[in-house]
């Protein structure tokens, strides 16, 4: 557990890229909660939102008083993190906005190829510590990998319709289940690594544009970071794909310990 997948790009992956086999997939920049509903306010106290000015770019997950996990493809030159938010149109009592001090992508993440979703994970170090409480608190990292069929919660401010985009004002939640690795690989042949996990539902509940970097939480433990999926979103046979946290716990903890 905690050992990341190998970094090397296999020759067959390069062949697939050359042949255009990645067409129809999207790395959701900023990725929605389809077939969900408004979350109970502050029921996801670890939920973070990444902003450039007033523009929402991605979700994130608070994992320490100065640390947020998100997707590596969400990295920007200058941006901030909002915590304790529910409605994006009004200021919530626990809401706090903190500037990003450092963005640390996984060392194996491939910035040069936007269609390579491997190792899509990044730690953000905040300039100041968050004020923690019942409505703003870190989530626990999963010690074990998720089980097939396990029920999980996804959340975000991403679009609630696809392919047409319609962004909600409030945080949305939906329930999904963990898919087997075989089912995941059948949905996306040749594109799933051991550092990814799929989750979805028969009604099409899914993450989408605006949700990238947000949490997949199962039994109160962080099991995934929203990474990529099909376009349009919400196809039951094409589940959302998440960076599998249990494969990166060693890197996460080591990175945080070395910079605290």
UniProtKB/Swiss-Prot annotation:
GO terms for cellular component: cytoplasm; extracellular space; serine protease inhibitor complex. The active site is at residues 73, 120, 212. Its EC number is 3.4.21.118. Glycans are attached at residue 110. It is an enzyme of class 3 (hydrolase). Strongly inhibited by diisopropyl fluorophosphate, leupeptin and (4-amidinophenyl)methanesulfonyl 1-fluoride. Expressed in the limbic system of mouse brain and is localized at highest concentration in pyramidal neurons of the hippocampal CA1-3 subfields. Also detected in spinal cord gray matter and in keratinized stratified epithelia of epidermis, hair, tongue, palate, nasal cavity, pharynges, esophagus and forestomach. In skin and mucus membranes, expressed in stratum spinosum and stratum granulosum. Expressed during estrus in vaginal epithelial cells but not stromal cells. Within the vaginal epithelium, expressed in prickle cells, granular cells and parakeratotic cells but not in basal cells. Its main location: secreted. It catalyses: Cleavage of amide substrates following the basic amino acids Arg or Lys at the P1 position, with a preference for Arg over Lys. Disulfide bonds join 39-173, 58-74, 145-246, 152-218, 184-198, 208-233. Gene3D superfamilies: Trypsin-like serine proteases. Residues 29-32 form a propeptide. One of its GO terms (biological process) is synapse organization. Keywords: Cytoplasm, Disulfide bond, Glycoprotein, Hydrolase, Protease, Secreted, Serine protease, Signal, Zymogen. Residues 1-28 form the signal peptide. It is found in: Secreted; Cytoplasm. InterPro entries: Peptidase_S1_PA, Peptidase_S1_PA_chymotrypsin, Peptidase_S1A, Trypsin_dom, TRYPSIN_HIS, TRYPSIN_SER. GO terms for molecular function: peptidase activity; serine-type endopeptidase activity. Induction: By chemical/incision-induced brain injury which leads to increased expression in axon fiber bundles of the peri-lesioned region, by electrically-induced seizure (kindling) in brain, by UV irradiation in skin and by incisional and chemically-induced skin wounding which causes epidermal proliferation and hyperkeratosis. Induced by chemically-induced oxidative stress which leads to increased expression in the hippocampal pyramidal neurons 2 hours after treatment. Residues 33-257 form the Peptidase S1 domain. Disruption phenotype: Mice display marked abnormalities of synapses and neurons in the CA1 subfield of the hippocampus with enlarged and elongated pyramidal cell soma and reduced asymmetrical synapse numbers. Mutants also display impaired spatial memory acquisition, increased hippocampal susceptibility to hyperexcitability in response to repetitive afferent stimulation and prolonged recovery of UV-irradiated skin. Interacts with SPINK9. Belongs to the peptidase S1 family. Kallikrein subfamily. Serine protease which is capable of degrading a number of proteins such as casein, fibrinogen, kininogen, fibronectin and collagen type IV. Also cleaves L1CAM in response to increased neural activity. Induces neurite outgrowth and fasciculation of cultured hippocampal neurons. Plays a role in the formation and maturation of orphan and small synaptic boutons in the Schaffer-collateral pathway, regulates Schaffer-collateral long-term potentiation in the hippocampus and is required for memory acquisition and synaptic plasticity. Involved in skin desquamation and keratinocyte proliferation. This is Kallikrein-8.
